[in-house]
UniProtKB/Swiss-Prot annotation:
Protein name per its UniProtKB record: Methylated-DNA--protein-cysteine methyltransferase
KW Transcription (keyword) present: no
Entry function: Involved in the cellular defense against the biological effects of O6-methylguanine (O6-MeG) and O4-methylthymine (O4-MeT) in DNA. Repairs the methylated nucleobase in DNA by stoichiometrically transferring the methyl group to a cysteine residue in the enzyme. This is a suicide reaction: the enzyme is irreversibly inactivated.
Organism listed in the record: Metallosphaera sedula (strain ATCC 51363 / DSM 5348 / JCM 9185 / NBRC 15509 / TH2)
Cellular localization per UniProt: Cytoplasm
Amino acid sequence: MIRYGTYMSPFGPITLVSEDEKIVMLDFCKCAEESLVDNNSFVGLFKKLDNYFQGKRTDFDDIPIRLNTNSFRMRVYKEVRKVKWGEVVTYKDIAEAVGTSPRAVGVALSKNPILLLIPCHRVVAENGLGGYSRGVELKRKLLELEGSLIKVPSIK
């Protein structure tokens, strides 16, 4: 069964979609028709999001996700899920781990359907922030919240 939820973060609304109790989408937008929203299905995740946005170290590893994508993106997303709160890695680091180019990693991350749970905001360029599907300013705010902005090359 597909369920929709809306969480109000300090950075704007987040839409969540689950299918058979697994998250298939988490995005910074208000994309769900209000009549379809059933926030009761997301109580556990909402508590984690509350902690996250209060600046508390939060681990989303126990939240089940389902990815409908190709094997290459799956490898990239799996590697990115290893990057924990307060850490940053470069596109090059991820590329070396999965055997591809930094540009290919960037393209894969631009298609990430489950933001925060697959923390692509923690992947940065060797010379700065790099891009983010919902804008570099949001990426900056998320890294600031996690206390890791200082670790970004050329931001120090």
